[in-house]
Amino acid sequence: MCGIITVFGEERDVPTDLLSHRGPDDYRTETMGKCRMDFYRLAINDLSAAGMQPFVRLNRMFMCNGEIYDHRSFRSGDERSKSDCEVVMNLVHTIGIENTVKSINGDFAMVYTDGKRVLAARDPVGVRPLFYTRYAKDSIAFASEAKALVFLGTRIEIFPPGHFYDSYVNTFICYHTGYWNVHKFSGTKNHERIRHILEDAVHIRLDNTDREIGFLLSGGLDSSLIAAIAARKIGRIRTFSIGLEGSPDLEAARKVATYLATDHTEVTFTVDEGLRALRQVVWSLESYDTTTVRASTPMWLLCKYIKENTDCRYIFSGEGSDEILGGYLYFHNAPNVDEFACENMRRLHLIHQFDGLRADRCAGAHGLDLIVPFLDKNFIQCCMEMNQTLKMTKLEKEVLREAFKGYLPDEVLWRQKDGMSDAVGTGWVGALKEHAEKMMSDRMFEITQGMCKHNTPLTKEEAYYRELFWVCYDARNDHLISEIWRPKWTTVTDPSARLLIEKNPK
């Protein structure tokens, strides 16, 4: 988790400290020809000065915010560091950008230049963030977060996942289409294969850091499985959970921690602490989406605690499973397998705007590197090629639960899906709605609705988050969230998992 800024074309003065929260360990700026690169380092792999970026070699310069998990297989012996990212510069130079991004297994947002031409690329599902803006003729800028491009004063856009950019043709080119073919579902249920691929995804990530490792543990299926796999591999691990006093997540996480014999830390927060953090959370997220803000606030507070009280900087989390396996409760309402499959792919396609965004920004706000094994490209491929009818089960993600029998206590392994904003404590979502009612008069709500041509808020809570977003980024950036996250095939518009259960009990 680092911060990168690139300005290519007309020269511009780039303010410093724009992304120091993402990369608090070091900062460097380099210029080659028409290209300037600014790098904010969070040292994870090769902590020495040799691992500092941008990497500059004769007539080429490169930087990458990311992790390349199979970097050892690409080493030529000419590298000057042990950094997992340095090998990518040599690959781009020898085999080209398209062949490089198709070959590597990693989470990345990268930029390469020879001073006359700039190339940029983002991983297939957008685990690592990247934005761009065209600020002048034949000029383009890239950055890890939208806030780092605001100074240029031009429209900011999301760099599309699974694409690379080439200034020679001045366009974005899709290099990855493997997950998006609705007719490409012929696989069978194979518990051993699912287990092996996910375990491998965790193991290669455990082996890719020189920093102390931690695990976010909500007590739900996904984060608990990641912790269980890691504990079997490396022994005693360090886990962290957060919730309001007496919350379901804290209780469930405690059971998992005891079962796995982890070094466990519980962090409690109050409603007032959460409400006070909202403006900072929205600034960090660059989002006004309701479920994202609700779930991000406790996660943001937990990451803040980890940064301030531990040496853990390489943090595992469980995002991605619901998007890959159709794990959200509203998927039970899918009328047929075709619609289930299409919505499954749509959720994965948009993860970089919702759960993926939450994971990256909450950790990045506090200089932590968040690792998401469920979004390993091999695991995604395995699950998306599966016969989709195998995902349409009475209890969500049964195929995953069955593959990992014995890894967790049964009451956790077979625990029903609960949204993070619900499970951190029954009072949290209610308190947010009540707070929004106090902050937004009926007239103010009406005015805000009228100002929102895109993603018009349906509730005062949604309008309140939009107002907080405007304080940080103004209405010109509303388009950075393509839609508000809402369940499908139901009259419920609130994203709360508990409301879905109450409205559509099994």
Residue ranges and their predicted role:
Residues 26-27, 79-84, 407-419, 445-448, ...:
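Short, surface-exposed acidic
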